[in-house]
Amino acid sequence: MDFKEWFCLNGRESFTIDPKVNPDDARFYFGREEIKNRIKAQLRRSFVEPGVPKMVIYGSFGSGKTQTLFHLEHYLQNECPEACRQTPRILHLDLEMHSKSDHKDWHLQLVETLGKSTVSAWIDRLFSRTQNLDTELRSIFGNVNMAEAAKNLRAGGDIGLLAWRWFCGYELRPNELERLNVTRSLGDLGAGDMVNALVGIGRLAERNEEKLIFLMDEAEQFKNVKTGDATESLHTYLRKLAEPSNSSVGFIIASYALTLDDMAELLVRADVRTRIGENNFVEIPPLPSIKDVEIFLKELLAELIEQNKAEEKIQNESLGVSLETYPFTADAFEVLCEFASQDPTKALPRNLIKAVNECAISAWDERKPIIEPDIVNEIAPLIFG
């Protein structure tokens, strides 16, 4: 009998949760009702004012920041707030920064994540229902160069690719600029120029009944930037994106940090924090008490184990365990919760899930139908010690 059947797993191969591998895992958010409700309330309010979410979440490694991002995507796609009048177009990216990265690198990552085909399709749909595409694009972008480049995205071949390179912020040669009928490369005027183009794309999305929202993970990467001018340009890009006037491009940024001061300095400067709003900086802490650990584990087991099959197995094999803690005996479950809570900084979702999985694998390897205290005593110190 394989591992899945051994523990009556519900359509999965292990106790591991990873929404990057299994998108359906995004629906899970165990043991943190207060934080979940707070973030969702902030999201709902954000579509009223400023019109899109602008938020930073932070916590230690393994605290569940990535799961939070994917869960928020699941929420927006399945329970879209009434105040969001367009369909959310949600895009994930893991930020990558090196010592000399600047606003151009950040902009490129955002635009490339969005993709040429998406923006071109928006322009095509706009063209199909407007009498004057030039006028519409100038109204959307508020800039002649951006409107001309956007119009060229409809073209196939080299000219369409050239227009996309312009929006990505590449420096174009004079003859390439002439082909696009633009007077300069995007970004020649600085970081704000690139933000204006991105916000213009957001307004284009709105004309197509979509709301553009970026979910950016691993923002601790900003600490890799060592050049002063590069850091300032990144800060300017974020400050401009956080301006109240931007109601078209939303963002939720996730960063490793034990406190606000642990984050990259550009994320927490006063001018950024006042624009984003102090209540939109949300900590994802470890589980604070043994009771919270118990709730997390029970909710996890209830979701990942097929309850009817497990109940039948418990009865047929006289396992003498409760369905609430299966496949752990009551004593083993208590021992695991105690280990996890000894050091509050280690009571993290990643550690708890790993402990459950490792204990289950050990029991399966020994052909034991349930997890007893001796297995927990062997595994838990390696994870929480």
For each of these PLM feature ranges, what is it?
Residues 1-55, 75, 372-373, 377-385:
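A short, basic N-terminal segment
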Residues 1-14, 18, 36, 172-328, ...:
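The catalytic "switch" region of P-loop NTPases
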Residues 24-25, 53-58, 220-224, 338-341:
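Glycine- and acidic
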Residues 38, 42, 67-75, 102-114, ...:
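Alpha-helical scaffold elements adjacent to nucleotide-binding pockets in ATP/GTP-utilizing enzyme cores
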Residues 44-47, 73, 77, 199, ...:
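Alpha-helical repeat scaffolds in large eukaryotic proteins
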Residues 48-208, 349, 363-366:
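P-loop NTPase nucleotide-binding core
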Residues 50, 194, 231-234, 345, ...:
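Active-site-proximal structural scaffolding
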Residues 151-152, 274, 291, 295, ...:
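C-terminal alpha-helical "lid" subdomain
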